[in-house]
Amino acid sequence: LLAFLFPIIVSANTDGPVKLGGRLFIDGGLFTKNSYSTHAKAEITDIRLTGKITLPDEWYTKIDVGFASNKVSLKDAFVQKKWGNNNFRIGYMLGMCCIEQSASTNDYVFMTGANAAETFYLGRRVGVSYTFSQNKYYCSAGLFCGDGAEYDDKVLPGYNATLRGVFRPLNEAGELLHLGVGGLFRRPDREKEQKDRLVTFSSNGVTGLSLRYWT
């Protein structure tokens, strides 16, 4: 497999408290050995429209909608409040497990995140989170719903909890050394007919191309 990645970020932000933006990610690959006649492939792996509103007293809200794979999916819809070094957030958002997931995917060096971050990534969930950040220390905790936002009487809902901590002994302009640890607790949903709850982990690897091109 020879992979070539094309991250294209398209944004159009307006001045003022209301900002609109978007992005388009194209992932391509040249497969030297597979069972398909086509060995080169490119896909639009992510396309989004984003709206952000900054309100007085450090209130902030964001709505992010994705349109990749011929589907409309909600990516983010949350309200955030900041008090000095403290940040509170509630809504539909990332269930973060590691410090890397604090950064926007627009800032990733590669198309995907690190395998550890991708594997233990909760996905987006309805929940609440708290973050404390200053020059030397950072900590964040979150509590989120289970595997879905809608339930019926046949499903016993689960929940998820995350915790992250970072110590930055060196954090100056052009210089950074940080040491971090992250924790994840998962209690997945369970149908009442089943006895066990099932936890699954997966990762995108180095590309977002469809799995069929890997075979």
Language model segments and positions:
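Outer-membrane beta-barrel biogenesis signature
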Residues: 3-23, 29-38, 189-214
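Outer membrane beta-barrel
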Residues: 14-32, 36-149, 153-188
